[in-house]
């Protein structure tokens, strides 16, 4: 079913481009926006534009942060273990681990994984930035890299690639323990399972 209004269809199309949003959900979102006062629509539009204009990637870990808070609060936070870096695929994975309140080290966000079928190679994700952080002249001594990528074929491929790059540097490489279903995304795993996976990490 398509509406007679081109403006409504354009709004539905825009919502449907969001990850995990099908056309049925997109229609509901569009109808919800239309039923709200104009002020609410303006607030939504303003929030979207502000996020695009003001949010940047942390110059250290590549997680998202406000432009005026770079480096991010995790990289600069007191009490964080500077010797351990947990490598994740996306910012939502950082949020998942932070919700557990168990892990106290630092992070590095790749913003993707190696996927030859999609034309994504090592140079297309933040591997170079990770290796730069591991150089002695960068300051603090990193003793452990925790690979916490999603348990997919692409995630495993990326983990193997990283382990081979990092091992010659004399830094211990570990990966979170099994127990997370193959193909699952970390952002949807409950806090208890993630905590156990981090606590039970093993040498890669």
Swiss-Prot record:
SUPFAM superfamilies linked to this entry: Recombination protein RecR (SSF111304)
SMART domains according to UniProt: TOPRIM
Domain Toprim: 83-181
PROSITE patterns in alphabetical order: TOPRIM (PS50880)
Zn finger intervals (C4-type): 58-75
Entry keywords, A to Z: DNA damage, DNA recombination, DNA repair, Metal-binding, Zinc, Zinc-finger
Function: May play a role in DNA repair. It seems to be involved in an RecBC-independent recombinational process of DNA repair. It may act with RecF and RecO.
Family affiliation: Belongs to the RecR family.
PANTHER family, sorted: RECOMBINATION PROTEIN RECR
Name recorded for this polypeptide: Recombination protein RecR
Organism: Chlorobium phaeovibrioides (strain DSM 265 / 1930)
Gene, per the UniProt record: recR
